[in-house]
């Protein structure tokens, strides 16, 4: 079953642009020959790392959006693991995230609809109670006697 994955990896900051392009094209070729498709490649540039990784404080971020089988992703991760230029990587299955967000949105919409219905019912009850609470006799114009 084809699923969508995001693979983000960080490469050494001292890597040249040619070496980075070579690494990216190697991974693209590997994904293509394994039967997967690359939806997008986003080179996010050089950024500071949150903590030191392998004596590096900066890294160049690359984000792949891949559609393919789990075995393909396993092979991509294996290749990233053995590359000396790659200092960190993470893979996320996007379709699971989309399902979770859809579920949260459905729950939120249900709650909003429930609140809207409840508010409408309360307003209708208040309008119905308002005429009943009004006095039946008009107030007299004469002031009440002082005691």
UniProtKB/Swiss-Prot annotation:
Gene Ontology terms: biological process: translation
Region (Disordered): 114-147
Membrane-spanning intervals of the chain: none
Signal sequence interval, chain numbering: none
Key words, A-Z: Ribonucleoprotein, Ribosomal protein, RNA-binding, rRNA-binding
Biased composition (Low complexity): 119-147
Function (record text): Binds together with bS18 to 16S ribosomal RNA.
Protein name as catalogued: Small ribosomal subunit protein bS6
Gene that this sequence comes from: rpsF
